[in-house]
Amino acid sequence: PRITHLIGGTPWQGSAARTSPVFNPATGEQTGVLDLASSELVGEVVTSAKAAWESSWQRASLTQRTQALFRFRELLNERKAEIAELITAEHGKVVSDAIGEVTRGLEVAEFACGIPHLLKGGFSENVSTKVDVYSIRQSLGVVAVISPFNFPAMVPLWFVPVAIACGNAVVIKPSEKDPSAVNAVAALWKEAGLPDGILNVVHGDKEAVDALLTHPDVKAISFVGS
């Protein structure tokens, strides 16, 4: 099957000239064909993610964020066996290890459910004559997650729920060796009610990574190499 990008809540097929085979390492069988993003496509995705963030998630109340996070957590718990099967088929680890990986990611999603209530600023009264000081916490905007081959579900789940809980839009670039688990998890976010464009998945190689690293509208990057 064709493994596409997920952009603005919709599967998005890239150029036919930019693809890569995906294999089951246990059998050597080709299991899919992965679309690879060009630098131009990455730029378009970041721009659209920023627009979605400005129009929706940046303005979302803490209650709205929490509702999406709790619903995502429930969906992830219900579907973790399905996601584990995708990991096993493309990564090669045994199913029990794959389920353990998703469970570790689920723990972070559970933690993130409480973050909106922890995003408190500070206030200090009369720090100087007739001067009060206060601080507030604000989202950054578009952030990127570049995840490795060895934990295709757990590593993105370390970062994405926290970034979304804090009000950011996210662009994920999974490993091109085992991309399907990230697509499956991203679909759960949409089902949980996250606005389109707040979570995007772009598949690719060095060209896509370089485009994310150098884009001026990407305000933070989470990277784990392997």
Q: Where is each model-derived feature located?
A:
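Terminal low-complexity tails and localization/encapsulation signals of metabolic enzymes
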Residues: 1-33, 67, 71, 121-146
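Histidine- and aromatic-rich ligand-binding microenvironments
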Residues: 5-6, 21, 30, 34-44, ...
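Alpha-helix N-cap/helix-start motif
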Residues: 15, 42, 80, 98, ...
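Short connector loops/turns at beta-strand edges and beta->alpha or beta->beta junctions
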Residues: 25-27, 47, 163
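Residue-level signal for inorganic ion chemistry
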Residues: 28, 65, 87, 109, ...
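Glycine-rich loop-to-alpha-helix module at the N-terminal edge of alpha/beta enzyme cores
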Residues: 31-119
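Rossmann-like NAD(P) dinucleotide-binding subdomain of oxidoreductase/dehydrogenase enzymes
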Residues: 121-226
